[in-house]
From Swiss-Prot:
Source organism of this protein record: Sinorhizobium medicae (strain WSM419) (Ensifer medicae)
Co-factor(s): Mg(2+)
Upper taxonomic lineage: Bacteria, Pseudomonadati, Pseudomonadota, Alphaproteobacteria, Hyphomicrobiales
HAMAP family, alphabetized: PII_uridylyl_transf
BP-aspect Gene Ontology terms: nitrogen fixation; regulation of nitrogen utilization
Protein name as catalogued: Bifunctional uridylyltransferase/uridylyl-removing enzyme
Region (Uridylyl-removing): 378-733
Mechanisms controlling activity: Uridylyltransferase (UTase) activity is inhibited by glutamine, while glutamine activates uridylyl-removing (UR) activity.
Key words of the record: Hydrolase, Magnesium, Multifunctional enzyme, Nitrogen fixation, Nucleotidyltransferase, Repeat, Transferase
Region (Uridylyltransferase): 1-377
Domain notes: Has four distinct domains: an N-terminal nucleotidyltransferase (NT) domain responsible for UTase activity, a central HD domain that encodes UR activity, and two C-terminal ACT domains that seem to have a role in glutamine sensing.
C-alpha cells in the first residue's frame, strides 16, 4: 500500500523529534506517567509548530492540495513515532516476531494522503490472526495520546478476515478500505489486506459499487441543498464540492483500477484539458477548505457569510467595479462547482460507454443508463436513446452549429432527458458558438421557443446553463453565471435566481400556483404578449454586478437583446420597461402607505396602462418567489393585491374619493349583515367603531373574528386583551392586540415581539372611534405543529400584555432576551435617512435604511415619539440583513415637518440609532401605558404597518 511519496521536512524535523523521544524514554524509564506527560508535551509542541508552518505556507503559495498533504504527512510522522515509542519503550515489543505485529493504516480522506486542518483522523488498526497480548493495550495507549493531543480520532481494530466480511455487507466500510493506506507497523499485514480486498471484494462488483455511490451522492445533495448555487455552500458535502470529486475517484479506483486520477487520461476517460480542470478544481476547493478550518479553528465545512469575506482576503481577491472581493471569490467558487458538475457528466458518459463494452446488460444497474435507440421524428441529427436525446453522429455540431440550440429544443418538444455523451460533446463544442451563430435567425427562434415553452422551460434552460451553452449564446447572461450577491436576502446565485423565476412564471401559466397566487393565476391567461413577459423575467437581473443601477443597465441590455431574439419594436419597449421597473411594485407595496391616494396616483403614472400593470405584478411575484425559501409570504401577496386593485381602479377611471366612500359603506353594510345574530342596536354601534381604511383593507371574515374578540373582551371588562391564530398556508401566526390607544403603542408591541424572538412579517394597525387600538401583528411560524405554534404565540401575547400593563419593563426585557445575529455581523449597511414631503399630500415620509437587528423597530419608533412626531403608518421591510423602514409622520398638531433644522435633527438621531449608538430614548421606552384616558395615536383613525423580516 502506498505511503506519502514526498516528505516535508519544513513541517517537522523527524530526526529531532525521534531523538527527543529517545531522551524521554531514557529519562523516565521506570516512570510511566511522567514519561507519558513528557511525550505528550513533545508531540503537542511538534503538532502546533507543524500546523502553523502549514498555514504559513498555504498563505504564501495558495496550494490547497499541498497544504492537505503537508498536514497528512505531519500526522503520519507523529503516528509512526508514537507507534514505535509505544511498542519499543512502553510494551517492549521491539523484538516481537513479524507474525504478531500490528499495522496502522489510514482510511477515509486521511487514507488518500490529504487531511484538512480540523478533520477527523480515521485509523484502521490491523491485527494478525493470532494477536499478541500487548496488541490491544498498545493500541489503547496510542489512542489516548492522540485524544489528549486534541485529535478527533475515528478508529477500528480488526483482523483482515473482519475487514473482508464487513466490506461485503457495508458499503461505507468498503469505501473506507478502498482508500486504506499503510502508515506504519507490519507492511506484510497491510499488503495482504490490499490483495485480498482487491480479489475478494472489488473484482466483478463494479456496477454494484457505482450504483451505491451515485445513489449516495444524490442523497447527499438532497440533504445539503440540491443546487450548487446556494450562497452559503457546503465545501465538502455540497453539490460541486470536494465529495463529488472524491466520488469520481472512488469509482475510478474501483471500476478502472487506477491508483491516481492522472491515469484517467491514459484510459481516455478525461482529456488532458479536462484532467487539468479536475486538478485546478480540487486544488481550489482544498485551499478554501483549509483556510476555513484554520480561520475557525474547527472542521467548518459550510462557507457561511461570516467567514466568506476573510477567506476572500486570504486567497488574495480584491474589489473590482461592481463586484466586491468577496463576490469575486464566491463567483470563482461557483464556477469551480460548475466545473465539477461538467467533470461528473463527462465521467458518467465514459463510464456508461465502458460498461456497455464490457457487458451490454450491465447498464441497467444505473437506472438512467438504457440502450434502446429510436429515431426522432423530424430530425436525422439526433436519436432517442432510452428516453435520452443522443447524437446520431459525432460531427453533428461541427456540421451545423445551430444544432447546439436545436438539440435542446428537440429534447423539450419530445420530453427527453439528455444522454451524458451528448452533453459531453456539447461541452467540447462550445467554441462553435460564435458571434455569427448568436445572430442566426433560426438559432434565436429556437431559443425563444425554448424560453416560452408551455412544458417546462426551466428544466431545458438549466441544462443549457450547466452545459455553458446559455452563457455562450447570450454573453450578457454568461457574465452573471455563478455570480453571488453578498447579502442574506438572496439565497442563490444570479443565474440560478433567473432560472427559478422563469420556473415560477411557467408554473403560474400551467395552473400550478392557483392556490398560492390566485390573482396572477387569473391574470396570466389574458396577458396579450407572453413572449415579452418571459423574456423580461429571464432578463430582469441580467445587469447585476455592474457599477450602475442594475435596473437601468438591464434595460439597456434588454434593448440590445430583444431585436436579436426577433421581438418586435413594441415587444422590445415592453421588455425594456419591465426590466427597468421590475423593483418598483414590490418597493411601493412594501414601503409606502397604500391608503394614501398620492401613493396610488404616483405609481399609476409610472405604470400608465392596465396591461403593463398586469405584467409587472406577475414579474414581481416571480422575482420574490425566486429569491429563496421563506421570502414569499401571504402578507406580501396581500400588499401586492391591494396595490394592484387600487391602481387598476385608477387606470380604469374608477378611483375617486366618492368611490372609496361607497365601497366603505358597502363594506360596513356587509359587516352588519354578517353580525345578524347580534341585537340590531349593538351591531350598528359596533360597525360605527371602524374607519374607512379598516373596512376597505381587512377581509370580512377577519372583521367578524375581530367583532367576536372585542365583544368578548368588553363583556369581561378587559381593557387589554390578545388573541392568536396560526396560518399553515401562509406560514405566519397572527397576534391581535386590543388596547387603549397610545402614541408609543407600536414601540411597545414591536419591542415585546423582538424580546420574545418573534420575527415580524407584517402588521395591521387600526384605531377605533372610541380611542382603542386594534393591532394585528404577523410573525413567522417557528413550529410546524399547530398546537406548539399556538402555545408559542400565546406566550408572545402574554409578554405583550405584561409590558403594556407594566408588570414588566420593556428595556429590561429586551436587554435580557435579545441577542445579535451572528450571521448579520458579517455585513455592513451604511445608515441612511431620507425625509420627503413630496411622497404624500398629508404626511412627511421618513425612510430609514440600515443593518437589521433585534429590537431596532422599537428603538426607531421610540426616537420618533421622543422627537414629538406622530406616526400615522409604518412600513417595515427587511431584505436579509438590511432593513428599510418607512414612516408617515406629522408633528403633534397634524402638520408636515418643513423646518430644515428639525429635519436635520431627526436624521441625526435616527442615524445614531441605526449605527447602534446608545440613545436616551431607549431608556425611556414606555411600559404600563394603559391609562383610563388614552391618548390617541392619530386623528385619521386608522393605520397600516407592513413588515417583512
Amino acid at each position: 500500500m502506498a505511503r506519502h511519496e514526498t516528505s516535508f521536512p519544513e513541517i517537522l524535523d523527524v530526526a529531532a523529534l525521534r531523538a527527543r523521544c529517545d531522551f524521554i524514554a531514557s529519562a523516565h524509564a521506570e516512570q510511566r506517567e511522567p514519561m507519558r506527560r513528557a511525550l505528550l508535551a513533545a508531540f503537542k509542541e511538534a503538532n502546533i509548530a507543524g500546523r502553523a508552518k502549514a498555514r504559513e505556507l498555504l498563505a504564501a503559495d495558495g496550494a490547497g492540495i499541498k497544504c492537505a498533504e503537508r498536514i497528512s504527512w505531519l500526522q503520519d510522522q507523529l503516528i509512526t513515532l508514537l507507534h514505535d515509542f509505544v511498542l519499543n519503550q512502553v510494551f517492549d515489543a521491539a523484538k516481537a516476531p513479524e507474525t504478531s505485529r500490528i499495522a496502522v493504516t489510514a482510511v477515509g480522506g486521511y487514507g488518500r494522503g490529504t487531511l484538512a486542518p480540523g478533520s477527523d483522523i480515521d485509523l484502521l488498526f490491523l491485527l494478525p490472526a493470532k494477536k499478541a497480548v500487548w496488541a490491544e493495550p498498545a493500541i489503547e495507549f496510542m489512542l489516548y495520546i492522540l485524544w489528549d493531543l486534541g485529535f478527533k480520532v475515528g478508529h477500528a481494530t480488526r483482523t483482515i478476515e473482519d475487514c473482508i466480511r464487513l466490506s461485503r455487507a457495508d458499503m461505507t466500510i468498503r469505501t473506507a478500505i478502498l482508500e486504506c493506506r499503510y502508515v506504519c507497523g507490519s507492511v506484510a499485514l497491510a499488503s495482504e489486506l490490499e490483495t485480498r480486498f482487491d480479489h475478494e471484494i472489488v473484482r466483478n462488483t463494479g456496477p454494484e459499487f457505482i450504483a451505491a455511490k451515485l445513489a449516495e451522492r444524490d442523497e447527499r445533495h438532497r440533504k445539503a441543498g440540491d443546487t450548487r448555487y446556494l450562497v452559503e455552500p457546503n465545501v465538502k458535502e455540497g453539490k460541486g464540492g470536494l465529495r463529488d470529486l472524491h466520488t469520481l475517484f472512488w469509482i475510478s479506483k474501483y471500476f478502472y483500477r487506477v491508483k491516481d486520477s492522472a491515469d484517467l487520461v491514459k484510459l481516455g476517460v478525461l482529456s488532458r484539458q479536462e484532467y487539468k480542470l479536475f486538478q485546478k478544481a480540487e486544488d481550489f476547493l482544498w485551499a478554501v477548505r483549509c483556510h476555513m478550518h484554520f480561520l475557525t479553528g474547527k472542521a467548518e465545512e459550510r462557507l457561511s457569510f461570516d467567514i466568506q469575506r476573510e477567506i476572500a482576503e486570504a486567497l488574495g481577491y480584491h474589489d473590482h467595479p461592481g463586484l466586491s472581493a468577496v463576490e469575486r471569490f464566491m463567483k470563482h467558487y461557483f464556477l469551480v462547482a460548475k466545473d465539477v458538475g461538467d467533470l461528473t457528466r463527462i465521467f458518467c458518459s465514459a463510464l456508461e460507454d465502458q460498461q456497455a463494452k464490457d457487458a451490454p446488460g450491465i447498464s441497467g444497474v444505473i437506472s438512467r443508463f438504457r440502450n434502446r435507440v429510436r429515431k426522432i421524428p423530424g430530425t436525422l441529427d439526433f436519436v432517442d436513446d432510452g428516453g435520452r436525446i443522443a447524437l446520431a453522429s459525432p460531427d453533428v455540431f461541427k456540421r451545423d452549429p445551430v444544432n447546439l440550440l436545436r438539440m435542446f429544443h428537440i429534447a423539450d418538444i419530445n420530453g427527453l432527458e439528455f444522454h451524458p455523451a451528448a452533453l459531453k460533446q456539447v461541452t467540447r463544442s462550445l467554441s462553435l458558438i460564435t458571434p455569427h451563430l448568436r445572430e442566426n435567425e433560426e438559432a434565436n427562434r429556437l431559443f425563444l421557443s425554448i424560453l416560452t415553452s408551455r412544458r417546462n422551460p426551466e428544466l431545458i434552460l438549466r441544462r443549457m446553463n450547466e452545459a455553458a451553452v446559455l452563457g455562450r449564446f447570450i454573453p450578457e447572461f454568461g457574465k452573471i453565471v455563478s455570480m453571488m450577491q453578498f447579502n442574506m436576502y438572496h439565497h442563490y446565485t444570479v443565474d440560478e435566481h433567473l432560472l427559478r423565476a422563469v420556473d415560477v412564471l411557467s408554473r403560474i401559466e400551467r395552473g400550478l400556483e392557483e392556490e398560492a397566487h390566485p390573482l396572477t393565476a387569473m391574470l396570466m391567461p389574458a396577458i396579450e404578449d407572453r413572449e415579452a413577459l418571459y423574456v423580461a423575467v429571464l432578463l430582469h437581473d441580467i445587469a447585476k454586478g455592474r457599477p450602475e443601477d442594475h435596473s437601468v443597465a438591464g434595460a439597456k441590455v434588454a434593448r440590445k437583446l430583444c431585436p436579436r431574439f426577433r421581438l418586435s419594436p413594441k415587444q422590445t419597449e415592453t421588455v425594456v420597461w419591465l426590466v427597468e421597473e421590475h423593483l418598483t411594485m414590490s418597493m411601493v407595496a412594501q414601503t409606502r402607505d397604500l391608503n394614501d391616494r398620492k401613493t396610488i396616483v404616483d405609481f399609476a403614472e409610472r405604470v400608465q396602462s392596465l396591461e403593463r400593470l398586469k405584467m409587472l405584478l406577475i414579474l414581481t411575484v416571480c422575482d420574490i418567489r425566486a429569491v429563496g425559501p421563506g421570502v414569499w409570504n401571504g402578507w406580501k401577496g396581500q400588499l401586492l393585491r391591494t396595490l394592484y386593485y387600487e391602481t387598476e381602479l385608477l387606470l380604469s377611471g374608477g378611483f375617486s374619493e366618492l368611490s372609496r366612500k361607497e365601497r366603505a359603506k358597502h363594506a360596513a353594510d356587509m359587516l352588519e349583515e354578517a353580525l345578524a345574530d347580534w341585537p340590531k342596536e349593538e351591531r350598528q354601534t359596533y360597525v360605527r367603531l371602524h374607519y374607512q381604511p379598516y373596512l376597505l383593507t381587512v377581509a370580512l371574515d377577519e372583521q367578524v373574528r375581530h367583532a367576536a374578540f372585542i365583544r368578548e373582551a368588553d363583556a369581561a371588562g378587559r381593557t387589554l386583551a390578545t388573541m392568536v391564530r396560526t396560518h399553515d398556508f401562509h406560514a405566519i401566526t397572527e397576534i391581535t392586540v386590543l388596547s387603549p390607544d397610545h402614541p408609543r403603542l407600536l414601540t411597545v408591541i414591536a419591542g415585546a415581539c423582538a424580546a420574545a424572538g418573534a420575527n415580524i412579517v407584517g402588521a395591521q394597525i387600526h384605531t377605533t372611534s372610541d380611542g382603542r387600538a386594534l393591532d394585528t401583528i404577523l410573525v413567522n411560524r417557528e413550529f410546524s405543529v399547530a398546537e406548539d405554534e399556538t402555545r408559542r404565540a400565546a406566550s408572545i401575547g402574554k409578554l405583550i400584555e405584561d409590558v403594556l400593563s407594566g408588570r414588566k419593563k420593556l428595556p429590561d426585557v429586551i436587554a435580557s432576551r435579545t441577542r445579535s445575529k451572528k450571521r448579520s455581523r458579517a455585513f455592513t449597511v451604511t445608515p441612511e435617512v431620507t425625509i420627503s414631503n413630496a411622497l404624500s399630500n398629508k404626511f412627511t415620509v421618513i425612510e430609514v435604511e440600515g443593518l437589521d437587528r433585534t429590537g431596532l423597530l422599537s428603538e426607531v419608533t421610540a426616537v420618533l415619539s421622543d422627537l414629538s412626531l406622530d406616526i400615522a403608518s409604518a412600513h417595515i421591510t427587511t431584505f436579509g440583513e438590511k432593513v428599510i423602514d418607512t414612516f408617515y409622520v406629522t408633528d403633534l398638531v397634524g402638520s408636515k415637518i418643513t423646518s430644515e433644522n428639525r429635519q436635520m435633527n431627526i436624521a441625526a438621531r435616527l442615524k445614531a440609532v441605526l449605527a447602534g449608538e446608545v440613545d436616551e430614548a431607549r431608556e425611556r421606552m414606555p411600559s404600563g401605558i394603559i391609562a383610563p384616558t388614552p391618548v390617541p395615536r392619530a386623528s385619521h383613525g386608522s393605520k397600516a404597518t407592513k413588515a417583512e423580516t
